[in-house]
Curated annotation (Swiss-Prot):
This is Cytochrome b. One of its GO terms (cellular component) is respiratory chain complex III. Heme b b562 binds at residues 83, 182. It is found in: Mitochondrion inner membrane. The cytochrome bc1 complex contains 11 subunits: 3 respiratory subunits (MT-CYB, CYC1 and UQCRFS1), 2 core proteins (UQCRC1 and UQCRC2) and 6 low-molecular weight proteins (UQCRH/QCR6, UQCRB/QCR7, UQCRQ/QCR8, UQCR10/QCR9, UQCR11/QCR10 and a cleavage product of UQCRFS1). This cytochrome bc1 complex then forms a dimer. GO terms for molecular function: metal ion binding; ubiquinol-cytochrome-c reductase activity. Pfam families: Cytochrom_B_C, Cytochrome_B. It comes from Viverricula indica. The keyword Transmembrane helix applies. The chain crosses the membrane at residues 33-53, 77-98, 113-133, 178-198, 226-246, 288-308, 320-340, 347-367.
Length: 379
């Protein structure tokens, strides 16, 4: 009798993706983040579903409905904080996953990489709209400031902003449509993630050495299922430490004040995971230039494969590029810090220097260092 794993049409798909999948024998813990992102997505959909049962997307009742969830709904507080902090864990895993792709040259799988960039944009859009839903001060003003950036687009900008708002300001129509999009986007992300996996399994996984590993593969189960479960335990530990001990650590206190269009907070800023892009936006005095830099700070990932000059795929044996990569990581930490600071001296100058450094590393220095390393190895 044929094993059900190989004969049943549905079970066969699961088997070929998670059980009998041939995986390189040397992939490290950096390859855990793909599965962790899947777990984060499932967690966010489940907690979000339960929150949506009690939330009302109306400007008059949105804030009090979130309060009601935390105070009156059974375990509502833990569901709410798991959802809010789950988003932070999601982005930590995302940044690690993208960083691993850049370090080990996974961007040479062009279809997988490009769908990954689409996924990144979709997750960022979902997180932004989710931040608006509690209808606190930072929700309202964050929505106003970020959507207003689209008015920098020549000719159609103002009409586009009013079309997104559903009126002449951020109001009931905006909140309702943001809730609708925030609800549907995770399911679109799930579909995109399936396509991401489909293309990945066409080529097979990359590995730390960057070399073809077809001659040395092992089955995904039990070796990497056990390894992924360990990563999952760490993820749950970190999330629950955050949720149970300091649930508001990564949030903004201003969001506990109900939205008031007549009172602007002293310092409008997005959630921590957008601060690096926000710092790049603020570092350019021109509005359109800032918006372009903001979009390019993420879209630059699509250009990385075109700028790969090294004869080696991975940075594992390229010490110069390794130094540059960790400079880039330090630069992103600097940008994140600057994004949370007020717009005054010396933060403006530091932000501008960090922004120049960010684009210089990715567009100029990495290709140059790749060529230098080729010359040093006489290739």
């Amino acid at each position: 009798m044929t094993n059900i794993r190989n004969s049943h049409p549905l079970v066969k798909i699961v088997n070929e993706s998670f059980i009998d999948l041939p995986a390189p024998s040397n992939i490290s813990a950096w390859w855990n983040f793909g599965s962790l992102l899947g777990i984060c997505l499932i967690l966010q959909i489940l907690t979000g579903l339960f929150l949506a049962m009690h939330y009302t997307s109306d400007t008059m009742t949105a804030f009090s409905s979130v309060t009601h969830i935390c105070r009156d709904v059974n375990y509502g507080w833990i569901i709410r904080y798991m959802h809010a902090n789950g988003a932070s864990m999601f982005f930590i895993c995302l940044f690690m996953h993208v960083g691993r792709g850049v370090y080990y040259g996974s961007y040479t799988f062009s279809e997988t990489w490009n769908i990954g960039i689409l996924l990144l944009f979709a997750v960022m859009a979902t997180a932004f709209m989710g931040y608006v839903l509690p209808w606190g001060q930072m929700s309202f003003w964050g929505a106003t400031v970020i959507t207003n950036l689209l008015s920098a687009i020549p000719y159609i900008g103002t009409n586009l902003v009013e079309w997104i708002w559903g009126g002449f300001s951020v109001d009931k129509a905006t909140l309702t449509r943001f809730f609708a999009f925030h609800f549907i986007l995770p399911f679109i992300i799930s579909a995109l993630a399936a396509v991401h996996l489909l293309f990945l399994h066409e080529t097979g996984s990359n590995n730390p050495s960057g070399m073809v590993s077809d001659s040395d593969k092992i089955p995904f189960h039990p070796y990497y299922t056990i390894k992924d479960i360990l990563g999952l335990l760490f993820l749950i530990l970190m999330l629950m430490l955050l949720v149970l001990f300091s649930p508001d650590l990564l949030g903004d206190p201003d969001n506990y004040i109900p939205a008031n269009p007549l009172n602007t907070p002293p310092h409008i800023k997005p959630e921590w995971y957008f601060l690096f892009a926000y710092a790049i936006l603020r570092s350019i005095p021109n509005k359109l230039g800032g918006v372009l830099a903001l979009v390019l700070s993420i879209l630059i990932l699509a250009i990385i494969p075109l700028l790969h000059t090294s004869k080696q795929r991975s940075m594992m044996f390229r010490p110069l590029s390794q130094c540059l990569f960790w400079f880039l990581v330090a630069d992103l930490f600097t940008l994140t810090w600057i994004g949370g600071q007020p717009v005054e001296h010396p933060f403006i100058t530091i932000g501008q220097l960090a922004s120049i450094f960010y684009f210089s590393i990715l567009l100029i220095l990495m290709p140059i260092f790749g060529t230098i390393e080729n010359r040093l190895l006489k290739w």
